[in-house]
Curated annotation (Swiss-Prot):
This is Probable cytochrome P450 518B1. It is a single-pass membrane protein. It is found in: Membrane. Its EC number is 1.14.-.-. Heme binds at C437. Pfam families: p450. Keywords: Heme, Iron, Membrane, Metal-binding, Monooxygenase, Oxidoreductase, Transmembrane, Transmembrane helix. InterPro entries: Cyt_P450, Cyt_P450_E_grp-I, Cyt_P450_sf, Cytochrome_P450_fam2. It comes from the Eukaryota. Its main location: membrane. The chain crosses the membrane at residues 2-22. It comes from Dictyostelium discoideum.
Length: 490
């Protein structure tokens, strides 16, 4: 009996090895191991592995990998990326339906992880709240929070203390989102003890989101799904506690809502569910809130850290941007009573700042890999056959550093490249197509208002006079090493 089992296992391993390595061998890829596929190959700094592999296979356009049971395609060429995402939205309008995603998203009810039906409904609601006439309300929130962080930074500068970029940017962006989504802004968050609870909440959200990261083996091994589901349901507490807290917020809103005066995103979501006679609004809200708070806070806080990193390491740009901001204020004076000096009306007058922020997002995209898609039916593009059930993940790191499109200095910090060319054909940090980031304007506006006013008010220096580390740490988002900076009032 035991011998037969061993023989069956060996035969299965041989079959799986042959299937993974010869079924789609006409598309170049590294050799895959049975069962686990390429997990060992990409386990260490996967963005660099993919970036190096792209030059060995398929003319630098894509690389095939096997993650467990799933054929996966890393898209490394911007033209191919746009062709697939713009021309085949119906075929790729799905996500990986693993037990981890199912657990976090309340059965795919979120906005990032949602299935096809839930996405259309929730996108229709949220797109109205993050764009259009709501933009003025959003900008007021950005300006108000920027005023508070600038005041705190002035205190830090006066005291001679260093500015903790990681914690304070997390507080800044989470406070905006908590205010907008839940009406739960924390006053004096930069000095108040309540910030510890907020940080703990955000760390918990990040832990939950990390569990669905690209290199989480059991999410891709179908045989493990029953066991993984049991583990997630009965032995993980972070997700349970987060959902419990968010459900309390939902119940509070349900009791106090004024249907004629919605206060925040949650009120609007409740009202839309009532209007549509939809059910289980609480579960949808929990999934949406986790995803919005995680994505909206972590991406922009890390981008802000990287922006300061490059300004510290390239002080000439810091001075040039400051001069540009002063010039913009002379042309377009700030509104009387405004919380900040620089606002969105100055944006057309600050081309160098705009180019510098674009360059930071090019070199260090918010996420190394765009949120992956799953093909729900087979299709063909440029002679490349993509079967049903294929996992597609654009490598933004590779797309934004391809010398074919960005020149020999693709790996260098050079903001001027965006002063002469918008690079619209190969620069899309918020994605493309039907399911691109719905909060792209929200994100860009809060980054602009926050970072311009920081540069306007302070000279930013490293605490030891040495350059800051520019090597990103791989994760759901690219993070720099934790660092502090010196602030000098201008």
């Amino acid at each position: 009996m035991l011998t037969n089992i061993i023989i069956l296992i060996i035969l299965y391993l041989f079959y799986d090895f042959c299937y993974k390595n010869f079924k789609y061998r006409n598309y170049g890829s590294p050799w895959a191991l049975p069962v686990i596929g390429h997990f060992i190959h990409v386990i260490n700094q996967p963005h660099l592995v993919v970036h190096n592999d792209r030059m060995k296979y398929n003319n630098g356009r894509f690389v095939n990998y096997w993650f467990g049971d799933y054929l996966s395609i890393a898209i490394t060429d911007p033209i191919l990326y746009k062709k697939i995402y713009l021309n085949f939205p119906k075929q790729i309008n799905s996500r990986l339906k693993s037990p981890t995603v199912l657990n976090i998203s309340e059965r795919f009810r979120g906005i990032i992880s949602s299935n096809e039906n839930n996405w259309d409904f929730h996108h229709g609601i949220l797109s109205k709240l993050f764009n259009g006439h709501k933009a003025k309300i959003n900008n007021f929130l950005f300006e108000k929070e920027t005023k508070f962080i600038i005041e705190y930074m002035k205190k830090i500068s006066k005291s001679g203390e260093n500015f903790d970029t990681r914690s304070n940017f997390l507080y800044f962006y989470s406070n905006i989102l908590f205010d907008y989504i839940l009406g739960k802004r924390v006053e004096n968050i930069y000095e108040n003890e309540l910030r510890k609870d907020r940080k703990k909440f955000m760390v918990s959200i990040q832990e939950v989101m990390d569990s669905v990261g690209l290199i989480k083996f059991l999410n891709y091994l179908i045989l493990s799904y029953p066991f993984l589901s049991i583990y997630l349901r009965y032995f993980t507490y972070t997700t349970f506690n987060l959902k419990k807290i968010l459900k309390q917020y939902y119940d509070e809103h349900l009791e106090t809502i004024d249907l004629n005066k919605p206060r925040d995103v949650l009120d609007n979501l409740i009202m839309e569910y009532k209007n549509q006679n939809a059910i289980e609004c609480d579960k949808s809200f929990v999934a949406i809130a986790i995803e919005l708070l995680a994505a909206g806070t972590d991406t922009n806080s890390s981008t802000s850290e990287w922006f300061l990193t490059y300004l510290v390491n390239n002080p000439i740009y810091q001075d040039k941007i400051y001069d540009e901001l002063i010039g913009a204020l002379k042309i377009n004076k700030p509104l009387k009573g405004s919380d900040v000096l620089i606002n969105l009306s100055h944006r057309p007058l600050t081309p160098l700042f705009n180019a510098t922020l674009k360059e930071v997002l090019r070199l260090i995209p918010a996420t190394p890999f765009s949120v992956p898609r799953m093909s729900n039916e087979g299709f063909e593009v440029d002679g490349i056959k993509i079967p049903k059930g294929t996992y597609l993940f654009p490598s933004m790191y590779s797309i934004f550093r391809d010398e074919k499109y960005w020149g020999e200095n693709a790996n260098k910090f050079y903001p001027e490249r965006f002063l002469t060319d918008s690079h619209s054909n190969n620069y899309f940090p918020y994605g493309v197509g039907k399911r691109m980031c719905l909060g792209s304007n929200f994100s860009q506006h809060e980054l602009y208002i926050c970072l311009t006013n920081i540069v306007l008010n302070f000279k930013i220096k490293s605490i030891d006079g040495k350059p800051l580390n520019e090597i990103p740490n791989y994760g759901i988002t690219f993070r720099p090493n934790i660092f502090e900076v010196k602030l000098e009032n201008r």
